[in-house]
Amino acid sequence: MLHLYNSLTRKKEPFVSLRPGKIGMYVCGITVYDHCHLGHARSMVAFDVMVRYLRSQGFDVTYVRNITDIDDKIIARASERDVSIDELTAQYIDAMNNDTHALNILPPDHEPRATGHIETIIRLIQRLLEKGNAYVSENGDVCYEVDTFPEYGKLSHKDIEGLVSGSRVEIVKEKRSPLDFVLWKKAKPGEPSWPSPWGEGRPGWHIECSAMAMHELGEQFDIHGGGLDLQFPHHENEIAQSEAATGKPFANYWLHVGMLQVNGEKMAKSIGNFYTIADVLKEHHPEVIRYFLLSSHYRSPLNYSEENLLNAKKALIRLYQAVKDVPPQTADSKLDEYWQEQFNQAMNDDFNTPVALSVLFQLAHEVNKSNSPALAHTLKNLAGILGFLQKDPESFLQSGLAEEEKLVIEQLIAERLKARAERNWTKADQIRADLLSKGIELEDGATGTTWRRIAE
């Protein structure tokens, strides 16, 4: 049975969906004012794997990942570049789609944008005003009054006073309490705005997600996810405003992905220590990046380094070597139940991908020993749930080399073939040994000599 670590209760719990066989999942997406960095990729890959696994277990998953396309940062960046907000957001939405496609991240079933749900947001704010959980401040903003929600802090597990310091709280002097947060911002000159019962303005960040989640999944759903940095105040505020409006629990399970770090610090644009997905893709195969991101449990911090990416590449090479000579899978190919069960046990333990990867390596060892097509197909199928081992093995094993390097290898193979034809076995063996020392393995066959990279 699947067990998930629920941030709300701080413990692993058996997963029971609200509707048998169906799962509603909402994950906070990006704010589109810049290129996605590898920290964004970690969160997207983590939830992508969760969705893939849940579907492999027969669940009908409705996966929603939003786009924040109106925000202070977006407005500021558009102004800096002297472009329209629509032009700016379109640019970075396209870039995000290119990144996710390259990383084999499945598109969500629904990808709502904040600007497409203004009426939904306004209706939710009206409910909060009617219930006495919100107020119109002196400057025309509509704010949520935290003191009206006694359970505030139940997600971050901190007392109210402790939450005030060191948080992403927007300081507005018209607030009744420092923790009160803006639901609707009064329009400012030159900024985009929409009509509302409280005058022209635009939605605050937190209310957008509550409104879009409830629009797509209903007032209650199963899983809400995002990066650990969103736990407070964003997710805490989502709970407060959603549950105050409906009187029901918002999401049953809260899952948070640990931070990607560089030298012990969170990778972030605000710090300037980030690597964009596009830049990392220039240097590393997409499946290598996926493997690296899954090498640590999703809740644990993960350190970015070239050494860790190199280790991921070596690991994938070993897996691809195990399946390189496997005949194509047929419709009646059956998967090995024992290894399926071992893999499922790992994933049922709060999506424990490091243990799942160790299962794949044990299975690869058995494939190498037995050369069993059934085991090899099982390996490819299970790895596919993690989103890799889906390329042509020969193509992958030759990837990552410059054309000049490939040309040198082909020239050496030609020299070796000539030496063999001349029965100069010493020279032929020396060329093979030299290439092997550089991580290139030759294989002689009826149609000629082929080569591939191997794990060094």
From Swiss-Prot:
What is this enzyme's catalytic activity, as reactions? tRNA(Cys) + L-cysteine + ATP = L-cysteinyl-tRNA(Cys) + AMP + diphosphate
Primary location group: cytoplasm
Cofactor info, note text: Binds 1 zinc ion per subunit.
Keyword NADP found: no
Show the GO MF annotations. ATP binding; cysteine-tRNA ligase activity; zinc ion binding
Question: Can you say where in the cell this protein is located?
Answer: Cytoplasm
Q: Does the keyword Protein biosynthesis apply?
A: yes
| Segments carrying motif 'HIGH' region | 30-40
Short sequence motif 'KMSKS' region: positions: 266-270
Task: Print the keywords alphabetically.
Answer: Aminoacyl-tRNA synthetase, ATP-binding, Cytoplasm, Ligase, Metal-binding, Nucleotide-binding, Protein biosynthesis, Zinc
Q: Which family does it belong to?
A: Belongs to the class-I aminoacyl-tRNA synthetase family.
InterPro entries recorded for this chain?
Answer: Cys-tRNA-ligase, Cys-tRNA-synt_Ia_DALR, Cys-tRNA/MSH_ligase, CysS_C, Rossmann-like_a/b/a_fold, tRNA-synt_1_cat_dom, tRNAsynth_Ia_anticodon-bd
Q: List this protein's GO terms for biological process.
A: cysteinyl-tRNA aminoacylation
Q: What is its EC number?
A: 6.1.1.16
Gene source species: Legionella pneumophila (strain Lens)
Any one Pfam family match given in the protein's UniProt record, by short name: tRNA-synt_1e
Q: Give me the Gene Ontology terms describing cellular component.
A: cytosol
The protein's name is Cysteine--tRNA ligase
Q: Which PANTHER family match?
A: CYSTEINE--TRNA LIGASE, CYTOPLASMIC (PTHR10890:SF3), CYSTEINYL-TRNA SYNTHETASE (PTHR10890)
Where, by residue number, does Zn(2+) bind?
Answer: 28, 209, 234, 238
Annotated residues that bind ATP are located at 269
- Write down the superkingdom of origin: Bacteria
Cofactor(s) listed in the protein's UniProt record: Zn(2+)
Q: How does it assemble?
A: Monomer.
Q: Which SUPFAM superfamilies match?
A: Anticodon-binding domain of a subclass of class I aminoacyl-tRNA synthetases, Nucleotidylyl transferase
